[in-house]
């Protein structure tokens, strides 16, 4: 109940439809890219390139490698330490599938320009906002612009649950996959679990797995910490 309440409050806070809590910001990045590369989603193709800034934390990059993606590093704007939009344009080629900007130290990336590029080039846009809770670009919270936004609640961040993370999205399909994939690929939290389980009548729905997945589940204590601070 605490985790669910925190998720609902965080979605409202960021101006997004859905929020899914996980056990760390690193897990949030891994889950986001694992959803978009999932064969059933196939928004980002394996062995394609993802443009990301050279100034970031390691776990922005590791999930790319884990999902057989190729990180393409570009420099940052020295005024803000966020991704240099001109260099993003220069780095795009036929192998590029996504852009993963990082809102760093409370500074927002230029989301208007990045959105325009991603739409014109048909690229996915994943926002790493792990260090930018509450930051806004033109009055809109970061994390809410792209396909998926990620946040961290590590003890040194603006909101802390000691350890914890969140992904936000406006896409219901991504939300359903996130609920399943953060918990082993279970169907337990899915809205269509009865429909799915009816196809596998010999298997107890409590033990039905229909997806790739991880154990990224947060605890109720983490949820309570989050509620208190939101």
Where are these regions (language model features)?
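Phosphate-binding glycine-rich loop
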Residues: 2-49, 63-67, 73-75, 140
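Short loop/turn motifs at secondary-structure junctions
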Residues: 15, 46, 95, 144-145, ...
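PLP-dependent aminotransferase-like
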Residues: 37-104, 108-129, 136
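Radical SAM/AdoMet-radical enzyme domain recognition
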Residues: 117-122, 140-148
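Active-site region of PLP-dependent enzymes
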Residues: 132-138, 145-230
């Amino acid at each position: 109940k605490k985790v669910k309440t925190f998720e609902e409050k965080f979605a409202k806070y960021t101006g997004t439809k859905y929020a899914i809590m996980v056990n760390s910001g690193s897990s949030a990045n891994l889950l986001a890219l694992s959803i978009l590369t999932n064969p059933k989603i196939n928004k980002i193709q394996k062995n394609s390139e993802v443009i990301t800034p050279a100034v970031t934390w390691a776990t922005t990059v590791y999930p790319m490698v884990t999902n057989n993606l190729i990180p393409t590093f570009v420099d940052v704007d020295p005024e803000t330490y966020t991704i240099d939009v001109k260099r993003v344009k220069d780095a795009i080629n036929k192998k590029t599938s996504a852009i993963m900007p990082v809102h760093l130290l409370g500074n927002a990336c230029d989301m208007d320009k990045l959105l325009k590029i991603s739409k014109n080039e048909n690229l996915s846009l994943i926002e790493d906002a792990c260090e930018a809770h509450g930051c806004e670009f033109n009055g809109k919270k970061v994390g809410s612009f792209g396909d998926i936004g990620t946040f961290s609640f590590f003890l040194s961040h603006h909101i802390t649950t000691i350890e914890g993370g969140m992904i936000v999205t406006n896409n219901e399909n991504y939300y359903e996959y996130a609920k399943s994939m953060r918990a082993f690929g279970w169907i337990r939290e899915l809205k269509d679990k009865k429909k799915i389980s009816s196809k596998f009548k010999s298997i107890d729905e409590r033990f039905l797995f229909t997806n790739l997945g991880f154990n990224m589940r947060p605890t109720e204590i983490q949820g309570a910490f989050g509620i208190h601070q939101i």
